């Protein structure tokens, strides 16, 4: 299986673009729970967002254009994530004032650095990966999805081109990164949201990798750098929706 989209081949990886759009859609569904509606069940489809973003990072790192043609630090990729990690924190805090963790971008950034250290084995990327691991260990309580979430892109890199059942390994990390004690406790007495969340965490890596191995027969809008802005802007949009609903 080849998930690469190197510059010397025409076209884009439509499956990867579709995966990113589905991850965005899942994220927005999850955050609709905070606008004032009684839609707690949206927590279940929301479990697909983070693993699919991590899978997209793994695919980008595994492309021949990154890993073979130019085996060096992906400074531009890191820079965009770092910039939007900072830009997103204010709208994130405005929308989720009681949040005890940072927005998801720092988790994805650290995960990218660690996965890159494995994928592109040179002294610079290795040192950066070790620093990222140290920062994760120190500040994991402030990171969304914790240590397991930071390691998820690396786990996807390791299983990306293996048989589909290997997707169970990132599924374990997906469960560990979520509130698994509460989910399993809820599932033990039959809570449908808890049961659905566990199923979603297990299925997300499997479905994501299966999608990437398919070839969509329809056009997909390319997810280019402008798409980074969706993350902070969707918080502001949902904040506005909550304000309108609060006046009704």
Range-by-range predicted roles:
Residues 1-248:
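Alpha-helical transmembrane segments and their immediate juxtamembrane cytosolic regions
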